[in-house]
Amino acid sequence: MLDMTFEQFNSLNFKLYDGNPVIKNPLNSFVIADPSVIEAEYSPDGKLHLFAHGFFGVYHYISDDGFNFHKFAKVAVNAMRPNINYIEGKYYLFYEKTRPVIFNFLSMFGGKWESDIYCIESTDLVNWTEEYPVITHTRDYEDFGKGHAISNPFLTKFGDKYRLYYSCGQTFIEDCGFGEPTHISFAESDNVSRGYISLEKPIISPDESSLHLNLCSGCLKVYHLSDCYIGLQNGIYKRDGKSHSGIVLLKSDDGINFEYIRDFLSPQMCGDNKWMAQYVYACCLSKQGNKLRLYFNARNTSSNVTGRESIGIYEADI
C-alpha cells in the first residue's frame, strides 16, 4: 500500500526525467517493454531490479540509482509482459507465456495465437524454479480468432485474497500491424501461486464512445492507497486517423468498478526526440526514498519498419 490519500497522490507534480529513455531497445529486438520493478529495500543486494521483455523473452536489469541499468540475464524464454513481486521472503515473477517466436509471427497472418500466465520463483533473483501455469484459458472472453490470449499479469492483495489482474483477447491494430489486449479482468485465489478463478466477465472492455479505449483496453495496474484504489490504464484509441496509447488515472473503492479521473501521461514529443510520440504503454509505480517513479515503455511510431519501444521514467517528489 502507498501511504497517501487519493487527494495527495492526485496533487503530485509528475515530470518526465530529462535523461529518458533510460533503457533502449536491444540490438536483437525492436522493443524493450512492460517494466516491472523490485525496489532496493526489497532486493537481496540493495540494488534496484527491473524486468522487461524483448522479442526473445523476459530480461533482468540491475541499477544502483534507478536511472542507469545494465542487463544481467534473460530469465524466461517465449515470455513477455512480466510482473515481479516480493512476498514473505520469495520473489514471484509472473509473465505471459507464448509459443515460440515463429508462431507469434505467423499469428499476424491468420495463424493461431495461444498465451497464458505462468510464474517462476526465486529467493535471490539469480536462481529460478521451473516455470508453471497460473492462469490458463477458462473464459470465452479470452478468445480471439482461432486462439486465446491471457496477458499483462499484475498481482495485488485484497484482504486474505490474492488478486491477479490480467488482460485478455486481442484486437488487431491496423496501422501497427499487431494485436493489443481487448479486455481486462482478474482472477482470485487464497494461494499466491495456484488456484486462481477468473471472473465470469471482464471488468473493462473497449468503448467506441471513449476517447481513451475506443479500440481496445490495453492493461491495468492497480495500487492501494490509504483511502481507495487507483488504476493506471493504457487503453488503445484512435484519433485523427491513427492509433495511440496513453496512461489514464482511474479511481475505485473496490478494485472492480473504476472511475476515469484524468489523463495521466500522454504521448508527446520530448524536444526533438520522438521516442514517446505516438504511444505510452504499460507502467510500474515505484517508491524510492522521497520520489515516486513511474517506469513505463513508449513507442515512437506505428510503423513496423521504424517503430521502436524504450523505457522511461515519470517522477514526482513526495
For each of these PLM feature ranges, what is it?
Residues 1-148, 156-213, 223-276, 287-318:
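Beta-rich carbohydrate-recognition and catalytic domains
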Residues 153:
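Active-site lining segments of carbohydrate-active enzymes
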Residues 218:
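A carbohydrate-recognition surface predominantly in extracellular/luminal proteins
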Residues 281-284:
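C-terminal structured domain segments
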